[in-house]
């Protein structure tokens, strides 16, 4: 059993944060909320998503798992006004999700969860450096880097966090000292990442006051931030691009 009501803009932002990784997901539902762990087809990026029951205006659920096509949900929410309420109810026997929004009623066919890639195992990484910054600053640096290159270097040197992109003739670099950051735990960190992935991953951070980056040397980066006014969280784990000598 699953029956819930939630603000349309909040749900739209949550779905968008997941959709940058995969098109189809397994929603694990229980009385405490909804969670997803998913990895992209190339095994480069992983998303870990949690949306607590407190994010909803109404929430009543037993433990269950449903398969969802995120593109269909995105299209459906595209016609909703930001202040609309989205009401959802699961029809378990028919494998349908009933959705009411903006006076319109939808019957969404669900996917068989067994046909969707199983939850990945989340690796336990010791990442020595941690940077906390405003989401808009991260988005700005990535946007600038896109114009120069297809990858970006991110690292920590002494008390400075830097993001750098180099093209054939041009380069761009943003440095942020401890006093410009919300928090900094210095450590050896310098890794190269694909902007094809970073560009999509940082899109949801534009509305976020605090984004935490955990880094190492030639290690994956963990990008972590709250959603739904603190009632949810999403973490992205992005593998580095290793340059051969």
UniProtKB/Swiss-Prot annotation:
TM region positions: none
GO molecular function (one): DNA polymerase processivity factor activity
GO biological process: leading strand elongation; regulation of DNA replication
Keyword DNA-binding: yes
Keyword annotations from UniProtKB, A to Z: DNA replication, DNA-binding
Keyword DNA-binding: yes
Pfam families in the cross-refs: PCNA_C, PCNA_N
Protein family: Belongs to the PCNA family.
Function: Sliding clamp subunit that acts as a moving platform for DNA processing. Responsible for tethering the catalytic subunit of DNA polymerase and other proteins to DNA during high-speed replication.
Assembly and oligomerization: Homotrimer. The subunits circularize to form a toroid; DNA passes through its center. Replication factor C (RFC) is required to load the toroid on the DNA.
Name of the protein in its database record: DNA polymerase sliding clamp
Originating organism: Methanosarcina barkeri (strain Fusaro / DSM 804)
Gene, per the UniProt record: pcn
